[in-house]
Amino acid sequence: MGQKVNPVGMRIGITRDWTSNWYADKKDFADRLNEDLNVRQLLQKRLKGAAVSRIQIERPARNAKIIIHSARPGVIIGKKGGEIEALRDEISKVMKVPVHITIEEVRKPELDAKLVAENIAQQLERRVMFRRAMKRAVQNTLRQGALGVKISVSGRLGGAEIARTEWYREGRVPLHTFRADIDYATASAKTTYGIIGVKVWIFKGEVHAPKPQAEEAAPQETEEEVK
């Protein structure tokens, strides 16, 4: 069977960047990585209803900078910034350095694979038919300017005895093209029949489009002067 590699991991360094940007000595690397994982788990747990798309972690000299991409920044900030202050203190205890938090708004959540996958998972938990949820998500994403969308759901769909996989695609999703800007994410829906996995691929266009070949200049005919 053909297996598909993670489109985001395959494009790191080409069209995508790392979500953790820092340097550490060999003896400190494992501790720093563990801190990053703990911070991400903490943020995902605390900001479950804030539509968080991506979390970037940077470590300048003796402090940390965390960039949270969210479709609902007001939920994270809270009244008069109270929520974000408490969050900053909690993260500082985990990372043991001063932390600066920046929130960036996701203006088009329909073009974000993580938010689309979580939205479908929430609909499945509310017992919405999986085909209706997939088609509605695909139409909304294409309406916002995506060139192609593919959605796959796996599990006991509709309460069936045997688990299966269903997928729906519109447009083109060129997974083999490295310059293609493809966003990919997964989510899980916890239903009464078990867990249903959701995968979303969104093709937004080509980042490094090939330059059109210059047309060969036609040889210019020069008129010789008649003596």
Curated annotation (Swiss-Prot):
A single Gene Ontology MF term assigned here is: structural constituent of ribosome
Q: Which domain of life is it from?
A: Bacteria
What is the role of the protein in this entry? Binds the lower part of the 30S subunit head. Binds mRNA in the 70S ribosome, positioning it for translation.
**InterPro entries reported for this sequence:** KH_dom, KH_dom-like_a/b, KH_dom_type_2, KH_sf_prok-type, Ribosomal_S3_C_sf, Ribosomal_uS3_bac-typ, Ribosomal_uS3_C, Ribosomal_uS3_CS
Q: What are the BP-aspect GO terms? A: translation
Q: Which organism is it from?
A: Coxiella burnetii (strain Dugway 5J108-111)
Q: Which family does it belong to?
A: Belongs to the universal ribosomal protein uS3 family.
The KH type-2 domain, residue ranges: 39-107
Protein name as catalogued: Small ribosomal subunit protein uS3
Q: Name one GO cellular component term.
A: cytosolic small ribosomal subunit
